[in-house]
Design a protein with these regions (language model features):
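Extracellular/lumenal and peripheral-membrane lipid-interaction modules
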Residues: 30-256
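Hydrophobic alpha-helical segments of integral membrane proteins
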Residues: 6, 26-31
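N-terminal Sec-pathway targeting helices
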Residues: 9-19
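Short, Lys/Arg-enriched N-terminal segments with co-localized hydrophobic residues
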Residues: 1-9
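Bacterial N-terminal signal peptides
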Residues: 18-27
Length: 256
């Protein structure tokens, strides 16, 4: 149960991360409406992203007409979790004239105008560990959370404390990988251990059924391509290999 609530919490964080993608993609079409004011598209998009997410660093590229966009934000915090970097390459459709910036739903309407995109998210182990140690003190009895990244995936462990007639203090551990498939972003190749003993497959399957997908593909408000998920000792890279634009206008920002 403790592991379930932990992963439900993280599912919400991943969802807000993909909403960042949506805002980033939507922002490009705010630019053309003010082109007559001589503020370039990439500058307008960049300023919107800085205002919304306060990144440590940001690079935005855009073609002259705004049909193609590349943006990379470094050091953003989403729901308490620091994300090392988020990148997006997008090919856009023509914006309808009736969408306005002050429309409450403009972010999501504009996200629908993405024809094709590639995204990338880089999450560092040190940032995830800091989040679990400081922000998640107690999730339904789950204490002393520890997280470890490796080439084999993610290991999350901790003590589950519950009281029923008397107090239980059980060491629990989950070893898992991530996959992006037709359902969305999911945990896969998962092993559940309680007090060091591997649990039956049906228990692990029940846990995964309640957790997966972390992000439903249908809830991502625009088409984004993710081709692989790479694990190392210090980071996870969820990527569709977005590449910077060539011969495009560039706007750079660094937090003071």
């Amino acid at each position: 149960l403790g592991m379930y609530f932990f992963y439900v919490t993280m599912r919400a964080r991943f969802f807000h991360l993909f909403l960042f993608f949506a805002f980033l993609a939507a922002a490009i079409f705010v630019g053309p409406h003010i082109s007559d004011a001589q503020e370039r598209i990439e500058e307008k998009v960049g300023k919107l992203l800085v205002k919304e997410f306060d990144p440590e660093k940001l690079t935005v590229q855009a073609t002259g007409g705004g049909s193609f966009l590349y943006a990379k934000a470094t050091g953003i915090v989403i729901k308490g979790v620091r994300i090392e970097s988020v990148s997006l390459y997008a090919m856009m459709k023509e914006p309808p004239n009736n969408i306005k910036e002050d429309d409450e739903d403009h972010k999501y309407k504009l996200a629908d105008l993405i024809h094709y995109s590639r995204g990338e998210v880089v999450l560092l182990e040190k940032d995830f560990t800091e989040y679990t140690s400081k922000e998640i003190e107690d999730i339904k009895g789950f204490k002393n959370l520890e997280c470890d990244f490796s080439k084999n995936g993610i290991r999350v462990s901790g003590s589950y404390v519950a009281t029923f007639l008397f107090t239980f203090n059980i060491r629990m551990e989950v070893l898992s990988k991530l996959a992006f498939d037709e359902r969305g972003l999911c945990l896969t190749d998962t092993t559940l251990l309680v007090a060091g003993v591997k649990q039956p497959e049906y228990l692990t399957s029940q846990l995964l059924e309640r957790i997966n997908p972390l992000i439903e593909r249908e809830r991502i408000p625009f088409p984004v391509r993710i081709t692989r998920i790479d694990f190392s000792d210090d980071r996870i890279v969820i990527t569709g290999n977005p590449q910077p634009l060539k011969d495009a206008n560039v706007w750079n920002y660094k937090r003071p």
